[in-house]
UniProtKB/Swiss-Prot annotation:
InterPro entries: Caerin_1 (IPR010000). Keywords: Amidation, Amphibian defense peptide, Antibiotic, Antimicrobial, Immunity, Innate immunity, Secreted. Coiled coil: none annotated. This is Caerin-1.6. Belongs to the frog skin active peptide (FSAP) family. Caerin subfamily. It comes from the Eukaryota. Contains two amphipathic alpha helix regions separated by a region of less-defined helicity and greater flexibility. It is found in: Secreted. Disulfide bonds: none annotated. Signal peptide: none annotated. Pfam families: Caerin_1 (PF07440).
């Protein structure tokens, strides 16, 4: 369903987004 797609996208994107946010903090 939609949530499974969002979950897959989140798992793919989060590892790239978290380091960027950490650097800005």
């Amino acid at each position: 369903g939609l949530f499974s797609v969002l979950g897959a996208v989140a798992k793919h994107v989060l590892p790239h987004v978290v380091p960027v946010i950490a650097e800005k903090l």
